[in-house]
UniProtKB/Swiss-Prot annotation:
GO terms for biological process: division septum assembly; DNA repair; negative regulation of cell division; SOS response. It holds the Pfam family LysM. It comes from the Bacteria. The lineage of its organism: Bacteria, Bacillati, Bacillota, Bacilli, Bacillales. GO terms for cellular component: cytoplasm. Inhibits cell division during the SOS response. Affects a later stage of the cell division protein assembly, after the assembly of the Z ring, by probably suppressing recruitment of FtsL and/or DivIC to the division machinery. This is Cell division suppressor protein YneA. PROSITE patterns: LYSM. The keyword Amino-acid biosynthesis does not apply. Belongs to the YneA family. Its main location: cytoplasm.
Length: 109
């Protein structure tokens, strides 16, 4: 079979498969490249969701109860319990968190 004969016989299938591949690549790039605009914070010893709400709720324009509910839902915390060393996503945009932290620490300090 020559390429011309294969093309003439299966051109619809070839175009369909190539279209699916291209759309799949676009979808993967969109999902992977999109990322989250929300900040991720590490939980310290003695922290709770309510302590995080006290610290960050003002930057998120949410009431503290709404803040805690959002964090529980987005981080799949059914009982609302977090432990030191956990990392949780909070409803504060990364740009807001970066703007409020105006101090710069050098690597050797």
């Amino acid at each position: 079979m020559t390429l011309k004969l294969i093309w003439d016989k299966f051109y619809v299938s070839i175009i369909f498969v190539l279209t699916c591949i291209v759309l799949g690549i676009i979808l993967m790039c969109t999902v992977v490249g999109g990322g989250s605009d929300y900040s991720e914070v590490n939980v310290n010893e003695g922290d709770s969701l309510w302590a995080l709400a006290d610290q960050y709720a003002g930057k998120s324009d949410m009431a503290k109860a709404d803040f805690v509910s959002w964090v529980e839902k987005e981080n799949n915390l059914s009982d609302g319990h977090v432990e030191a060393g956990d990392s949780v996503v909070i409803p504060v945009h990364k740009t807001k968190l970066l703007k409020s932290d105006s101090t710069i620490q050098l690597a050797n300090q």
